[in-house]
């Protein structure tokens, strides 16, 4: 294989994000992002409301010691519905 040739792995994990700041452009290219870098990037590009919902979700995930898939789904859905209800009231 030639050096510099894209493999299916690099094609699927490369992520290019272009953000405009002021009059210039900044290009950020993440190759083989680990989960922390990917999550940081995701939180940077989300809206404030979306970011708050994601933080609430991750706090719930981390607060569970040994979650089963069913218990996790039930708990997160309950909190999500409650949060959305409060958002409509406010």
UniProtKB/Swiss-Prot annotation:
Q: Which domain of life is it from?
A: Viruses
User: Bias category Polar residues: which stretches?
Assistant: 1-28
Q: Does the keyword Membrane apply?
A: yes
Recorded GO cellular component terms are: host cell cytosol; host cell mitochondrial inner membrane; host cell nucleus; membrane
Q: What else is known?
A: Is not encoded in all strains, and seems to be dispensable for replication.
Give the family per the record.
Belongs to the influenza viruses PB1-F2 family.
Name of the featured protein: Protein PB1-F2
Q: What is the lineage of its organism?
A: Viruses, Riboviria, Orthornavirae, Negarnaviricota, Polyploviricotina
Protein's gene: PB1
């Amino acid at each position: 294989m030639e050096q510099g040739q894209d493999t299916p792995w690099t094609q699927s994990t490369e992520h290019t994000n272009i953000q405009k700041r002021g009059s210039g452009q900044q290009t950020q290219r993440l190759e083989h992002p680990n989960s922390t870098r990917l999550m940081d990037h995701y939180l940077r590009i989300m809206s404030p409301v979306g970011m708050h919902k994601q933080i609430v979700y991750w706090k719930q995930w981390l607060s569970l010691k040994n979650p089963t898939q069913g218990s996790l789904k039930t708990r997160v859905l309950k909190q999500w519905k409650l949060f959305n209800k409060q958002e409509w009231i406010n």
